[in-house]
Amino acid sequence: MNSLSRRRFFGAAAAAGAAVSSPTILTNRAHAGAPSLVPRKLPFPPNDNFGSYEPTISADGNTIYFARFAHNGDTRVKGPTDIFVTHRIRQSGEWPGTAEDWSPAERLPNTVNSDSADQEPWITPDGNTLYFMSFRKAPGVGPTGIWVSHKQPNGEWGQAQPVPGGNINVSEYITHCFMPFDLPGQPSAMCFIGIRPREQGAPNTTDLYTTRQVDGVWQPAQRYADRLLDSIALKCRFSVVTRDDLTLGVVSVHDFGKFHTLLFVHYDPKSKEWKGPIVEAPFNDWNIDGACPNFQANGQRMIWSAGYDHGPDLISGGKDGAGGLYDLFWLPTSELIAYYKARASIG
């Protein structure tokens, strides 16, 4: 079993990233009369006693995929982490409904999961393709890589394979957090975090890369150079949504085993640059894991996992590759946008 910790793989790159100057425009200052931002917890189920990590939500909001740590007690987990799914089986009421509306979590089959760590799922809007990060070994794939499983005509998930082409997976380097990267006026794309050298002979750095499919073929990934994003050290995921005349970027920052929190920025379509001020999520707690969100395909909701109700606990990526007990939370994207606009004095 491959049980090596994320800290062992990512720690050196995180240290290198820390050398990048920290942004000086981060703000969490209060504004009188400004909108608040209070996470909403999903019912129990889909939450349960075994925890959920790094969820993704289907386009219709009725299916949630997430990872689960083995050490939290669910004996169905065969690797350090496996991917699970829960369904909203009664859909007549207001979302997310009550506990009676959701099915108990089920482990995805061995065509998806392995005896290595499998996590960071992202489901495509059509619900037929699941991308995720895995520690399993394969030719041309680094210590961690991006894998994909396609739903078969019978509704079952096919055998997962490494994502081919695009320089996404590179045999000696770490790749993780494969997420949508759709910007106004630009072709649909994906982004990921790559820990690799910027040029031949240079040290590894933690950077954002982008790629897109053309006629079903992934194009060569390019480092996404942006002054603001490059100034944020220890970033481990970048999530993007456009709603209410604003493109919001949510940066997950993670010093593995130490903290895992959220920062907000915005995109300027005229300059094609990301802008500040960088606004800290008001519910961040540097002793509690809470980051790595996904947005519903229509931009209606953000979903993520956090240990807010359990108090200080293990932060994911520690020396044992484990994590704390995390619950599923969500927020309407409109509230995120309103909060950021108020704090950033935009609009």
Please provide the spans of the model-predicted regions:
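Generic macromolecular interface patches on structured domains
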Residues: 11, 19-20, 93, 338
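Short alpha-helical segments used as structural interaction elements across diverse proteins
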Residues: 3-5, 26, 234
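Cleavable N-terminal signal peptides
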Residues: 18-19, 30
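N-terminal secretory signal peptides and thylakoid transit peptides that target proteins
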Residues: 1-17
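C-terminal segment of N-terminal export signals and the immediately downstream linker at the start
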Residues: 24-34
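Low-complexity intrinsically disordered segments
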Residues: 21-24, 244
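Short, conserved micro-motifs composed of acidic
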Residues: 32-347
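A general, composition-driven signal for non-globular sequence regions
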Residues: 1-2, 23, 155
